[in-house]
């Protein structure tokens, strides 16, 4: 069984909500990434999302764009990201790792070779931001051959027809984009978010995790009250880079933020 399914089953059995942090591989410097991954697990992460740096990350806001620029300045590419996962797997063979990124670097790598190498390294799935489900058939077949999960995005504006495509191709869970715009956006309106989320939830055969715009432990808990889980990215990356630039400990800073989110989610999650 894929690690993602095992984790989701365990969370369901324990009546807990998923917490998934996103970091960009190689940011702020390559040697920190594996230690960050372990710190986030220690601080309550259920699933790790690791970003593959790309020069034109169209869905990302300025925080993650800058993170990718910093990683690319260290010449971080697909092979480096896979090596980071290999290092992580030496001492953690249970926490799911999802690679999140864009099609171009993987297309250049070669779909079959990438899927083979990713699974061998210990990757469990991918989120390819710019791969529409209607065009995913070829990639989906390759991923299935190697046992790599395809995780798709959906949003308030996703049509019923597209949800059908997603349900045909997706594995594990879906990433629900809570806001129009880019990662790190502001103005999360909870009543509206809840109503739109529940519409998508009714159309989905898989758990639905909410990302984009979750900035505080309180906000994470409020979303977890109705959602299957939350994904936090830009706020976490801000904590990491601010600590690093202030010559403080990024591991401590990221761990403190995630621990507070975990605690807030569990306090509400245990009551639903």
Swiss-Prot record:
Q: Which PROSITE patterns match?
A: TRP_SYNTHASE_ALPHA (PS00167)
Assigned GO CC terms: cytosol
> What keywords does the record list, in alphabetical order?
Amino-acid biosynthesis, Aromatic amino acid biosynthesis, Lyase, Tryptophan biosynthesis
Reaction(s) catalysed by this chain's protein = (1S,2R)-1-C-(indol-3-yl)glycerol 3-phosphate + L-serine = D-glyceraldehyde 3-phosphate + L-tryptophan + H2O
Q: What does this protein do?
A: The alpha subunit is responsible for the aldol cleavage of indoleglycerol phosphate to indole and glyceraldehyde 3-phosphate.
Pfam families, from UniProt? Trp_syntA (PF00290)
What is this enzyme's class at the first EC digit? lyase
Q: Which GO terms describe its molecular function?
A: tryptophan synthase activity
Name the encoding gene, please: trpA
Protein name, as recorded: Tryptophan synthase alpha chain
The family line of this record is: Belongs to the TrpA family.
Q: Which domain of life is it from?
A: Bacteria
Documented EC number(s):
4.2.1.20
Q: In which pathway does it act?
A: Amino-acid biosynthesis; L-tryptophan biosynthesis; L-tryptophan from chorismate: step 5/5
Subunit structure, as described in the record: Tetramer of two alpha and two beta chains.
Lineage at the top is: Bacteria, Pseudomonadati, Pseudomonadota, Gammaproteobacteria, Legionellales
Where's the active site on this chain? 49 (proton acceptor), 60 (proton acceptor)
């Amino acid at each position: 069984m894929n690690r993602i399914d095992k984790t989701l089953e365990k969370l369901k059995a324990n009546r807990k909500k998923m917490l998934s942090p996103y970091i960009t591989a190689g940011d702020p410097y390559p040697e920190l990434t594996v230690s960050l991954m372990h710190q986030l697990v220690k601080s309550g992460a259920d699933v790790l999302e690791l970003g593959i740096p790309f020069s034109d990350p169209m869905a990302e806001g300025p925080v993650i764009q800058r993170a990718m620029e910093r990683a690319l300045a260290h010449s971080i590419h697909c092979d480096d990201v896979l090596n980071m996962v290999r290092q992580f797997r030496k001492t953690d063979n249970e926490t799911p790792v999802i690679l999140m990124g864009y099609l171009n670097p993987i297309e250049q790598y070669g779909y079959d070779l990438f899927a083979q190498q990713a699974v061998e390294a210990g990757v469990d799935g991918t989120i390819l931001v710019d791969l529409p489900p209607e065009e995913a058939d070829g990639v989906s077949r390759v991923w299935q051959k190697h046992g790599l999960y395809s995780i798709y995005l959906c949003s308030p504006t996703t049509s019923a027809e597209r949800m059908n495509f997603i349900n045909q191709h997706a594995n594990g869970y879906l990433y629900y984009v809570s806001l129009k715009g880019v990662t790190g956006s502001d103005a999360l309106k909870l009543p509206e978010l809840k109503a739109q989320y529940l519409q998508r939830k009714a159309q989905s055969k898989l758990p639905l995790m909410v990302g984009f715009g979750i900035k505080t432990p309180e906000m994470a808990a409020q979303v977890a009250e109705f959602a299957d889980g939350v994904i936090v990215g830009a706020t976490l990356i801000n904590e990491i880079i601010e600590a690093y630039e202030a010559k403080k400990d990024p591991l401590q800073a990221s761990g403190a933020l995630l621990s507070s989110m975990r605690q807030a989610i569990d306090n509400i999650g245990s009551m639903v």
